[in-house]
UniProtKB/Swiss-Prot annotation:
Cytoplasm recorded as keyword: yes
Signal peptide start-end: none
InterPro entries, per database record: Rab-GAP_TBC_sf (IPR035969)
Annotated protein name in UniProt: Oxidant-induced cell-cycle arrest protein 5
Gene designation: OCA5
UniProt-listed Gene3D superfamilies: Ypt/Rab-GAP domain of gyp1p, domain 3 (1.10.472.80)
One GO cellular component, as annotated: endoplasmic reticulum exit site
Family in the record: Belongs to the OCA5 family.
Keyword check for Cytoplasm: yes
GO biological process: Golgi organization; protein localization to endoplasmic reticulum exit site
Protein location: Cytoplasm
UniProt biased composition (Low complexity): 32-47, 172-199, 635-646
Length: 694
């Protein structure tokens, strides 16, 4: 589905660079067309040196401001134009404004640091999907996770129908040979002169069409960025500092690079820009700098960028040495990840837009097709073009319900599955949506929120704090390789101890055990959901008990302490269901949490609310601070103080570091609760279908 058309009358920002970026370029900063490679490197080194000097000055200002916060309440934030200095282009002082609610176990945090320092993508993926990556470490952890993500190693994106149709129309209009039979082609090839003439004409036509499409895409990207700036400041005439302009240039060119590489499969869409903008809220577009986009969650004093650490200063201050460690990661580290922003962005899009290969394409590949993933824009589009309706034949519906959780599906199939599950799990809200016609115009602008939720994984529509945690889950998604045993994965996790694994818990979407659960009598031969449950339990579970039967040598036993015979199985949680199917249940869980609010709104208000879902984890903390201010308390006096150091006999198991105010008695992790509730909704749905299918 294509996003709404951008008005061509919006003025463009003059600062944007219009130079086309070659696909082979790996530089973040956009060079001029006439520059040589050596000049590019020198310019980049000079910029990095200047940035390091400027950052040192900025750090001193931040430290001074932090000291002032302990004794004085900050009256107001500086106006955006006054927070930009000439040299650096931007000055971000940590404010005493609202902080996102965030709690994280210290033991798991230290384990995450260990995995990050060693570039252990197995361990990072485990923590990401189970507990989430600490937000201020995402700028280093996400590139590592994306580099080894299964959807990046074996990418497939559902082709856009419009791209396929345009290509077919171009081919048919340029040469009749594209639709002719093999005998016609043989007859045509006898006339070499006619063939060369037609070939040259076709090539020129393709080149002109490609140039026009590229120019149109570049103009659309610029206009969409202009709208984003207007969204932040409320005006197109805002004079942006040089740093902000440079960051936007990097984002713009990252999207250009992606469209140049993947344009034969998917056309440019507003969602592609929003993915880059949302990524830039956690990963600095400029290398060795801390500057990220603020996003929409903090708009009381509009500004475009801030320090990636600003939102979590309370947490960082509570762990000795963490501030220095993070500064080292930002300014000096080249070991963990050196991917450019556009490289991280491309990998992120491949994950968010991933779709399983159609069976027809798999069969073609098995029969000797040499087409790569970039050639998937074939005539398979007839399998997708008619899925914009909710009604399917019973056989197809059964296939979706039993296979979709494992294999995933197209966006049309996922939307249909979402509607089906919503009616099963939240019948009252589903009926209200039906009465208000909230879900009756799929594919139209009225229900655009649903596409932003399911197809684009919360891009634009969700708060950056909630979306960041959900993206952690998706980037950490990993299946167990059935050819690998427990010892292989246990070694990859650096022999993590039993207590830590228990703390990480089972997979959020763990599956019912059909053999041990009491259930009504049913015919096992006709129960397709019994087969699904059995498959999920067999394929995605690995425990220490399974491996103990395979131990043969003393050397392997020496590395793993033998458990007691009555000890519980040591389990490494692997992903159970497709991440985009898991996203469906996360979306249902989000709707459930907002049900009381939604039933009080009309059609227009519901769509507006769901298109810009507020973050409870952020607003709760904000309301808490407002209450303190109304009572006459100084917010600086309730800053989260450093926790008492543990005694020698006290373990890390009881230490939870918080980013919240010290007197906040009702600490919440809203989005973690939503994800856990999504697992409950998944099991509830699976059990219902398991029984009904009997």
């Amino acid at each position: 589905m294509q996003a709404s058309t951008i008005s061509p009358h919006l003025a463009e920002l003059e600062q944007f660079n219009t130079v086309n970026v070659p696909e082979s370029s790996a530089n973040i900063n956009i060079p001029s067309q006439n520059s040589h490679h050596q000049q590019q490197q020198q310019q980049q080194q000079q910029q990095q040196q200047q940035q390091q000097q400027q950052q040192q000055q900025q750090q001193q200002q931040q430290q001074l401001q932090q000291l002032q916060h302990h004794n004085h309440h900050q009256q107001t934030s500086l106006h955006p134009q006054h927070t930009h200095n000439g040299a650096l282009g931007y000055s971000s002082l940590p404010s005493e404004g609202p902080k996102p609610s965030f709690n994280y176990d210290l033991e798991i945090f230290n384990l995450c640091k260990q995995y990050l320092n060693n570039k252990n993508h197995h361990g990072l993926a485990l923590i990401a999907r189970q507990k989430g990556i600490p937000p201020f470490l995402r700028f280093k952890a996400w590139p590592v996770l994306l580099k080894y993500h299964p959807f990046v190693l074996d990418p497939f994106i559902q082709p856009d129908n419009e791209v396929i149709n345009e290509g077919n129309e171009l081919d048919s209009s340029s040469s009749t040979s594209s639709s002719s039979s093999s005998s016609s082609y043989s007859s045509f090839s006898k006339d070499s002169g006619s063939r060369n003439s037609s070939s040259n004409g076709t090539q020129r036509l393709h080149e002109q069409a490609s140039y026009n499409a590229r120019s149109d895409t570049e103009n659309r990207i610029k206009k969409d960025i202009s709208r984003y700036v207007q969204r932040i400041f409320g005006s197109l005439s805002t004079e942006l500092p040089s740093l902000d302009r440079e960051i936007l240039d990097v984002i713009e060119n990252a999207v250009k690079k992606f469209t140049l590489k993947w344009g034969k499969i998917i056309k440019y869409d507003l969602s592609l820009l929003w993915m880059a903008l949302n990524l830039a809220e956690w990963i600095p577009p400029l290398p060795k700098t801390p500057w990220v986009l603020v996003g929409r969650d903090q708009n009381s004093h509009p500004k475009l960028t801030h320090n990636v650490l600003d939102d979590y200063t309370h947490y960082i201050d509570n762990i000795p040495g963490l501030g220095n460690y993070l500064e080292e990661l930002i300014y000096n580290d080249e070991h963990i990840s050196s991917l450019a922003f556009h490289e991280v962005y491309e990998r992120l899009v491949l994950v968010l837009l991933h779709c399983p290969e159609p069976d027809s394409r798999k069969q073609t590949s098995q029969n000797g097709s040499t087409g790569g993933k970039g050639d998937v824009a074939s005539n398979d589009h007839h399998n997708h073009h008619n899925h914009h309706h909710y009604h399917h034949h019973h056989q197809q519906d059964q296939l979706n319900k039993t296979r979709l959780p494992v294999t995933g599906g197209t966006i049309e199939e996922r939307v249909s599955f979402f509607i089906f599950c919503l009616r099963k799990l939240l019948p009252e809200l589903s009926q209200y949506f039906h009465e208000e016609q909230i879900l009756s115009k799929f594919g139209c602008l009225d229900d655009e929120w649903l596409i932003w939720w399911l197809k684009f994984c919360g891009t634009k529509a969700w708060s950056k704090f909630d979306r960041g945690r959900i993206w952690d889950f998706m980037l950490g998604w990993r299946l167990k390789n059935p050819k690998k045993n427990f010892n292989y994965y246990y070694e990859k996790l650096n022999y993590v101890n039993r207590d830590t694994l228990e703390k990480l818990g089972p997979d959020i979407f763990w599956t019912l055990n059909s053999e041990k659960t009491e259930r009504p009598k049913m015919n096992p031969r006709n129960n397709s959901f019994r087969d699904l449950v059995h498959e999920l339990n067999c394929n995605f579970h690995i425990s220490r008990a399974d491996f103990n039967q395979q131990l043969q040598s003393d050397s392997s036993k020496s590395k793993i302490v033998s458990p007691a015979s009555d000890a519980p199985a040591l389990t490494i949680p692997f992903s159970t269901i497709d991440p985009h199917v898991a996203l469906i249940f996360i979306s249902i869980s989000l709707l459930k949490s907002k049900e009381n609010t939604l039933v009080e709104l009309d059609q227009h208000e519901i769509r507006q609310f769901l298109s810009r879902l507020p973050s409870k984890s952020y607003e709760y903390n904000h309301k808490q601070r407002k209450r303190l201010n109304n009572n006459g308390n100084d917010p600086s006096s309730v800053r989260s103080s450093k926790p008492s150091l543990p005694s020698e006999e006290k373990t890390l198991n009881t230490i939870i570091i918080s980013n919240d105010a010290q007197d906040n008695k009702h600490k919440i992790n809203f989005i973690d609760s939503i994800i856990n509730e999504a697992g409950e909704e998944w099991r509830k749905w699976l059990w219902t279908e398991f029984v009904d299918d009997g």
